[in-house]
Amino acid sequence: KSYLDYGIFQPIQIASTVALNGPQDCVKDVVQRYQNRRNVLVNGLNRIGWPVALPRATMFVWARIPDPFRHMGSLEFSKLLLREAKVAVSPGIGFGEGGDEFVRFALVENEHRTRQALRGIRKVLNLDDQEP
C-alpha cells in the first residue's frame, strides 16, 4: 500500500483514473456554466454599486461588505440579506476572524435565479439606481 491510496476504496480509485484520463468535454461545459454564473453575479453586484473583483478558478465569490453595512459584521449582514433580500450567503466570520468584513456567494444557482437575487440585494442595499 502506498501513502496515497491507503484506505481508499479501489473502485473509487479506478473511476477517478478513468475520469482524469478520459474525455474532458463535460469539464469544459461545467467550467463555462460556472464562468457564466460568476459573470452574472459579479457584473450585477458591480452595477448596483457593490464593487467585487472577478475571481478565477473557483465556484465562490468573496465580496467585501459595502461600507454602509460593514459595521454590522458578516453574520448580521448575512442575516439581513437572508431576511430582506431572500438571498443566502456565507458570513466570512465562519472562515476566521479575518473574514468578518466579507461574505461568500456560492455559484450554485442558474443565471435567472442569480438575477432575481441581485434585484433583491439592490433593494436592500439601495446603493445605486442601475438595474443588475
Question: Where do the PLM segments sit?
Answer:
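PLP-dependent class I/II
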Residues: 1-132
